[in-house]
């Protein structure tokens, strides 16, 4: 055991694809022997299929600071989900500490920001996701032009 991973799994999901863009969620799970539970990390990858280049979040939405995300969640402009796409609440004493550049395309013009376990909620929430609808994207882009 000696601090080595006991088990590692990886999977992916294509969340959106068209002629120019592909969006993938890549999840890696690891369990270290003796740990109370395993841990996982989910990464959103959005690529231009023509150039092969990653597409940064700011090409889609401009977010000035983490407080904008937190206010958006609390006001209902943005949707907040736990693992399994279950609607969740941002619990008291949990704050958005940074603007994640880890994102994926959901289709129909929506974008999801990805946060890892414990970043925006307890472990039972798993990964958490902040969804920007097309209207929310337009609102943020007007605000942060």
Q: Positions of the model-derived regions?
A:
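Compositionally biased intrinsically disordered regions enriched in Thr/Gly
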Residues: 1-145
């Amino acid at each position: 055991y000696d601090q080595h991973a006991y088990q590692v799994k990886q999977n992916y999901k294509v969340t959106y694809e068209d002629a120019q863009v592909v969006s993938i969620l890549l999840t890696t799970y690891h369990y270290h022997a003796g740990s109370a539970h395993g841990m996982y990390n989910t990464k959103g990858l959005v690529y231009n299929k023509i150039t092969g280049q990653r597409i940064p979040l700011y090409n889609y939405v401009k977010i000035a600071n983490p407080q904008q995300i937190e206010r958006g969640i609390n006001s209902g402009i943005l949707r907040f989900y736990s693992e399994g796409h279950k609607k969740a609440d941002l619990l008291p004493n949990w704050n958005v500490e940074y603007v994640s550049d880890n994102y994926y395309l959901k289709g129909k013009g929506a974008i999801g920001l990805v946060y890892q376990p414990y970043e925006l909620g307890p472990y039972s929430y798993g990964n958490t996701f902040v969804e920007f609808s097309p209207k929310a994207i337009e609102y943020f882009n007007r605000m942060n032009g």
